[in-house]
Amino acid sequence: GLCLASQLLTGLFLAMHYTSDIATAFSSVAHICRDVNYGWLIRNMHANGASFFFICIYLHIGRGLYYGSYLYKETWNIGVVLLLLVMMTAFVGYV
């Protein structure tokens, strides 16, 4: 939960300073890293937090495989749907 909360907060702070215009997108990222107080830290926390979040998800899936939780079909299918939703959300956030 803490990892997801930090992703939401850092993403919100980054979105406050980011512009998606094709001419100024790179400049806004440079502005975040150079001019915003601790902008470089917020950007790194957001990027590395996403990787850590997926590592935690994969460890959780591995634990479920190890203990045979895939035998509970309904629960396992809900987990697969949640994994796909998280992956789609991360892709949309990346693009």
UniProtKB/Swiss-Prot annotation:
Q: Which InterPro entries does the protein's record reference?
A: Cyt_b/b6_N, Cytb/b6-like_sf, Di-haem_cyt_TM
Q: Which UniProt keywords apply?
A: Electron transport, Heme, Iron, Membrane, Metal-binding, Mitochondrion, Mitochondrion inner membrane, Respiratory chain, Transmembrane, Transmembrane helix, Transport, Ubiquinone
Please give a single GO biological process term from the UniProt record: mitochondrial electron transport, ubiquinol to cytochrome c
Manner of cofactor binding, per the entry note = Binds 2 heme b groups non-covalently.
Primary location group: mitochondrion
Sequence positions that bind heme b b566 = 60
Needed cofactors? heme b
Q: Where located?
A: Mitochondrion inner membrane
Amino-acid positions noted as binding heme b b562 in the UniProt annotation, renumbered to this chain: 46
List the GO terms this entry assigns under cellular component, sorted alphabetically.
mitochondrial inner membrane
Please give one Pfam family short name.
Cytochrome_B
User: Where, by residue number, does the polypeptide cross the bilayer?
Assistant: 1-16, 40-61, 76-95
Molecular function, one GO term: ubiquinol-cytochrome-c reductase activity
User: How does it sit in the bilayer?
Assistant: Multi-pass membrane protein
Record keyword Zinc-finger present = no
Tell me yes or no: is Isomerase among this UniProt entry's keywords. no
What is this protein for, i.e. what is its function?
A: Component of the ubiquinol-cytochrome c reductase complex (complex III or cytochrome b-c1 complex) that is part of the mitochondrial respiratory chain. The b-c1 complex mediates electron transfer from ubiquinol to cytochrome c. Contributes to the generation of a proton gradient across the mitochondrial membrane that is then used for ATP synthesis.
Add the further remark from the entry. Answer: Heme 1 (or BL or b562) is low-potential and absorbs at about 562 nm, and heme 2 (or BH or b566) is high-potential and absorbs at about 566 nm.
Family, as annotated:
Belongs to the cytochrome b family.
Q: Spell out the subunit comment.
A: The cytochrome bc1 complex contains 3 respiratory subunits (MT-CYB, CYC1 and UQCRFS1), 2 core proteins (UQCRC1 and UQCRC2) and probably 6 low-molecular weight proteins.
| Protein name in UniProt | Cytochrome b
In its UniProt entry, the species of origin is given as: Gomphosus varius (Bird wrasse)
